[in-house]
């Protein structure tokens, strides 16, 4: 559980069990008893958006950071994000991330009999290990960030919540800054597009701070085409409104339309 091992120790760690009936809750309960920083919340299943919104309402810290259950943080992740936010008075800090596709052989793998650790041989065989980060390191204005976003409008880098640090007071001050509970796909991009409307100062990190494990059986891959099309059509209007608000719509019109047919780096 990497969040406990962060070099930044002034943490409140919220663990939200969204109705899981497996061993997740007992494990989380054990961790919460061992670490006073952990707040354990057990709730009926309501989906990722409602769960994140509950977590944001209950969080007491200055900043908000998100970690999905299947993924891991680098030990320095939170410290680096907070440090850059403080040093630059940033409303949002965005960082590069690693995408890892675990090795899963279709048939029994042939292992080297001369090497003793067979388990290690298997776990080290990764189909892909890629680092993604589209912005150069440094401070930028909202307009500069928005122009960068338009270069990769469908990317995980801009769309997800787990490679970013948000100001909690900015989220609390605006009731529309939340994950859409009506959407079942790209609800995190909806959150980011809404948050960007109120943020003014941005900072980008080129160091990868998050390890995203790309599981072919995850909700991202199992989303129905119709669901994805419906979500993209809805999000297109949010893109359009944001760039009209910034006075950047006309010069980015083609790139905004590109979002409808673009694919993510995953």
Region locations from a protein language model:
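Short aromatic/hydrophobic "clamp" motif used to bind/position activated sugar donors
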Residues: 64
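Short, acidic, metal-binding catalytic loop of nucleotide-sugar glycosyltransferases
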Residues: 1-10
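Active-site acidic Asp-centered loop
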Residues: 18, 67-69, 94-96
């Amino acid at each position: 559980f990497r969040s406990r091992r962060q070099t930044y120790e002034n943490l409140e760690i919220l663990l939200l069990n969204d109705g899981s009936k497996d061993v997740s809750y007992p494990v989380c309960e054990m961790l919460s008893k061992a670490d006073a920083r952990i707040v354990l919340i057990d709730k009926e299943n309501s989906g990722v958006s409602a769960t994140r919104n509950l977590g944001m309402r209950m969080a007491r810290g200055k900043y908000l950071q998100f970690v999905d259950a299947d993924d891991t943080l680098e030990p320095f992740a939170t410290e680096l994000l907070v440090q850059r936010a403080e040093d630059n008075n940033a409303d949002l800090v965005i960082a590069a991330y690693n995408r890892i596709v675990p090795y899963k052989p279709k048939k029994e793998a042939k292992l080297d009999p001369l090497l003793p650790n067979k388990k290690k041989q298997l776990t080290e065989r990764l189909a892909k290990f890629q680092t993604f980060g589209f912005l150069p390191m440094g401070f930028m204005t909202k307009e500069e960030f928005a122009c960068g976003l338009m270069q990769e409008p469908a990317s995980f880098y801009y769309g997800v919540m787990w490679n970013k640090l948000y100001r909690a007071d900015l989220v609390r001050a605006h009731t529309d800054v939340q994950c859409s509970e009506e959407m079942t796909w790209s609800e995190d991009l909806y959150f980011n597009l809404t948050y960007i409307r109120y943020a003014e100062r941005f900072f980008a990190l080129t160091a990868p701070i998050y390890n995203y494990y790309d599981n072919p059986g995850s909700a991202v891959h199992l989303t129905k085409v119709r669901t994805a099309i419906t979500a993209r059509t809805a999000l297109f209007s949010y893109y359009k409104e944001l760039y009209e608000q910034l006075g950047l719509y006309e010069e980015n019109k083609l790139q905004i339309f590109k979002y409808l047919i673009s694919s993510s780096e995953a």
